[in-house]
Swiss-Prot record:
Taxonomy, superkingdom: Bacteria
Record key words, sorted: Cytoplasm, Hydrolase, Nucleotide metabolism
Molecular function in Gene Ontology: nucleoside triphosphate diphosphatase activity
Lineage: Bacteria, Pseudomonadati, Pseudomonadota, Betaproteobacteria, Burkholderiales
The protein, known as: 7-methyl-GTP pyrophosphatase
Length: 197
């Protein structure tokens, strides 16, 4: 009887866990111990890819024989990274800055079995509509998106702040690009549509 290898999500993010649950594959979530400090001159896409691989490898080293998923997301406007605001004041300032502008989200993904690693970067372009202070305040009070880069949760009320969104994978904006991920998992022998044997 063939058994699928154990699947691990190298993340403590509840958003990524919820996304992976959609694939109906059994998995566990383990928080990786990775320094997320950007390197000098590192481009946002390179940072997201490096961190996704580092997270996957950090967990894979401790769990040989498992398939490990690492991911990271970096948001930028005009090439400058936008972090997680942490509190109301910084979130308000961030949303004022993003009003009427396009934000580029790099959602990087790495899958490894410890021997071989695949990676991808899925880009999402979000155009924010012009935002009034009243709209910003109402949104922040309703959703408190202080742990989200760009201060807007597209999977929730944050979608009301958007004018448009472009991406090859509509799930990428939430931080785990499922279209790219399912292709990678199939190449590692895990297919969500195939019953475990």
């Amino acid at each position: 009887m063939h058994q699928n290898p154990r699947l691990i999500l190298a993340s403590s993010s509840r958003y990524r866990r919820a996304m992976l649950e959609r694939l109906r594959l059994p998995f566990e979530s383990i928080s990786p111990d990775v320094d997320e400090t950007p390197q000098a001159g590192e481009a946002p896409a390179a940072l997201a890819l490096r961190l996704s691989v580092a997270k996957a490898m950090a967990v894979a080293r401790l769990h040989p024989g498992c398939i490990v998923i690492g991911s990271d997301q970096v948001a930028t406007v005009d090439g400058q990274p936008i972090g997680k605001p942490g509190d109301f004041a910084r979130a308000k300032s961030q949303l004022r800055q993003l009003s009427g502008r396009i934000v580029e989200f790099h959602s990087a993904l790495a899958v490894t079995d410890g021997q071989r690693t695949e990676q991808a970067d899925v880009i999402t372009y979000c155009e924010f509509r012009p935002l009034t202070d009243a709209a910003i305040d109402a949104y922040l009070r309703a959703e408190e998106p202080y742990d989200t880069a760009g201060s807007a949760k597209a999977e929730g009320l944050g979608i009301t702040l958007m004018e448009s969104m472009r991406s090859d994978d509509p799930t990428a904006i939430i931080g785990l690009p499922l279209i790219a991920l399912t292709g990678m998992l199939r190449r590692f022998g895990l297919d969500p549509l195939r019953s475990p044997s």
